[in-house]
Design a protein with these regions (language model features):
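A general recognition-element feature
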Residues: 1-242, 288-289
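Intrinsic-disorder/low-complexity detector
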Residues: 213-289
Length: 289
């Protein structure tokens, strides 16, 4: 992701997505949090992507949860692609800052702060480093006097089919993508649901997968995409074009592989290859064998 994208809004910052995450992952599908009850606070949410990677020096997204004009809680979400053994320390700092901010604002009543780690990793589960005491060595006689601090991790790639069905926002599309990627590293997008926040979804996929092919679709001359199926088709077309430009056998083999992954039949593949590469049918059939 380039410098010009640093201040752009991220997917989780949209209230419909944020509320969906809370309701599905925290409240077991009950519509406890409504999008119009959420209000941004404290930080301007952004990807810190100077080198294409996600850098988190500030809390990613923080929102007041309000009923009418009365705030009843503060929610915080941190995006992570890798397990971070220091996350409990970071979360203590974020939550402490949220409470301190309320005191500095001289609020009549301080509301609770609930923070969550949105973990997009697909290689391993977040099975450790979920509490302060896991991260430090404590003298046995001192243990009872050291307060523990636990963090709450939402493992996106391990959401169940039942949880995925409960999603009502673009979070469901993104979550399904990472669930399928965990099960099959070669998975190509095939979700037919319409994407509401196309720009934010594709940028999140690029950052969290480390592959900018999704973001480059935003700047293509072919226009906007509306579903992940269209994203896959656009990637196929891009592969064909690159194959033509390279004019090498590997380009054709790669195109055949991608077309098969998105469900094209051999007859359809033959027609596409003949049309784009201007080859004889017999030659094309050699690549399918």
């Amino acid at each position: 992701m380039g410098q010009k994208d640093i201040s752009e809004k991220i997917l989780v910052d949209y209230n419909d997505v944020f509320a969906d995450i809370m309701n599905v992952c925290i409240y077991n599908g009950k519509e406890i949090v409504k999008p119009d009850e959420l209000e941004n606070t404290f930080v301007h949410s952004q990807y810190k992507a100077e080198d294409g990677k996600l850098h988190e020096q500030e809390r990613d997204v923080t929102k007041y949860w309000k009923k009418g004009e009365t705030a009843i809680a503060i929610y915080g979400i941190e995006n992570q692609i890798k397990v971070d053994k220091n996350m409990p320390f970071r979360m203590i700092g974020y939550d402490g800052a949220a409470y301190r901010g309320q005191l500095l604002d001289k609020r009549k009543s301080v509301v609770p702060v609930a923070s969550f780690v949105l973990y997009f990793g697909t290689e391993e589960r977040w099975n450790k480093y979920k509490s302060l005491k896991e991260c430090i060595q404590i003298f046995e006689e001192l243990d009872n006097y050291v307060n523990d601090y636990k963090i709450h991790v939402i493992e996106v790639a391990w959401l169940t089919d039942e949880q995925l069905k409960l999603c009502k926002s673009d979070f469901g599309i993104v979550a399904n993508f990472f669930v399928q990627k965990r099960k099959n590293k070669e998975y190509e997008p095939d979700d037919p649901r319409e994407i509401q926040h196309v720009d934010a979804v594709l940028k999140l996929l690029s950052v969290m997968t480390g592959d900018n092919k999704y973001e480059t679709i935003l700047y293509s001359e072919e226009g906007k995409v509306n579903t992940m199926c269209e994203v896959a088709e656009r990637l196929v077309n891009k592969g064909i074009k690159q194959g033509i430009e390279q004019g090498i056998e590997q380009g054709i083999l790669s195109t055949v592989s991608v077309l098969r992954k998105v469900g094209k039949t051999d007859d359809e593949i033959v027609e596409l290859i003949i049309e784009e590469y201007k080859l004889e049918k017999e030659k094309v059939l050699d690549y399918l064998s």
